[in-house]
C-alpha cells in the first residue's frame, strides 16, 4: 500500500486539542513519510525580530518592515528554519511541495535581509516533529484538521487571522467547531 503524504498541507489544531502549545495553531507540514513528520507553526510570533536575529548572527538586515520571527515548534527551538518561494543556490535547501523551499543555512538570512530580496518568506525557530505513526494517530483522534496550504495565508495574512482563515478555506465556520471539553469554540 502506497503511503499518502500530507507534506505541503496545513494542519489546524481543533479547539479540543489538549496540548496548550498547539492551541489554535496552524502548521505548514514540510515533510511527512513513513518515518514521521516535520512541520512549522505559522501563527505564533515571538518577541524577537529578524533585525535582532541578524544582529546576533552578525548579519546585515536591511528590511526593517519584514521582521517577524515565529515559534516554529517545541523541538530544537534554537534552530532557525526559513520557508520561501524562490530557489536559492545554497547547500541544505529542501524543495517542498508546490514549489516552496525550506532551509536552515544562515546564508539564507543574509540573502533575505538584503533590500530587494524575496518578498515572501517565513522565519521560524524550532519545529514540530512526529515519530513514525504519531501524526496518523493524532489525526485518527481528530486532534487536527488538514487542508491544502494556501500561500496567501502562509505569507500575506496577519498571524492572528491564519487559524480562522485556514478553517474557513475548508468551508467550515470556526464558531461551529465543538470543543469537547468546553462546548462550542467561541
From Swiss-Prot:
Coiled-coil intervals: none
Domain of life, source organism: Bacteria
SUPFAM superfamilies: VC0467-like
A GO term from the CC aspect: cytosol
Signal peptide: none
InterPro entries, A to Z: AlgH-like (IPR003774)
Name of one Pfam family that matches: DUF179
Family, similarity comment: Belongs to the UPF0301 (AlgH) family.
The name this protein goes by in its record: UPF0301 protein Mmc1_0726
Record organism: Magnetococcus marinus (strain ATCC BAA-1437 / JCM 17883 / MC-1)
Amino acid at each position: 500500500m502506497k503511503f499518502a503524504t500530507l507534506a505541503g498541507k496545513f494542519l489546524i489544531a481543533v479547539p479540543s486539542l489538549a496540548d496548550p502549545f498547539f492551541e489554535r495553531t496552524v502548521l505548514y507540514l514540510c515533510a511527512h513519510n513513513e518515518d514521521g513528520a516535520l512541520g512549522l507553526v505559522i501563527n505564533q510570533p515571538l518577541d524577537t525580530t529578524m533585525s535582532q536575529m541578524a544582529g546576533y548572527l552578525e548579519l546585515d538586515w536591511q528590511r526593517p518592515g519584514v521582521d517577524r520571527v515565529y515559534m516554529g515548534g517545541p523541538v530544537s527551538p534554537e534552530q532557525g528554519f526559513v520557508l520561501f518561494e524562490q530557489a536559492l543556490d545554497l547547500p541544505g535547501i529542501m524543495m517542498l511541495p508546490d514549489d516552496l523551499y525550506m532551509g536552515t543555512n544562515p546564508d539564507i538570512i543574509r540573502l533575505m535581509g538584503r533590500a530587494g530580496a524575496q518578498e515572501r518568506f517565513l522565519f521560524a525557530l524550532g519545529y514540530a516533529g512526529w515519530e513514525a505513526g504519531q501524526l496518523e494517530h493524532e489525526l485518527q483522534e481528530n486532534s487536527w484538521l488538514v487542508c491544502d496550504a494556501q500561500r496567501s495565508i502562509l505569507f500575506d495574512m496577519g498571524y492572528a487571522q491564519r487559524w480562522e482563515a485556514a478553517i474557513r478555506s475548508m468551508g467550515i465556520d470556526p464558531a461551529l467547531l465543538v470543543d469537547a471539553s468546553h462546548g462550542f469554540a467561541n
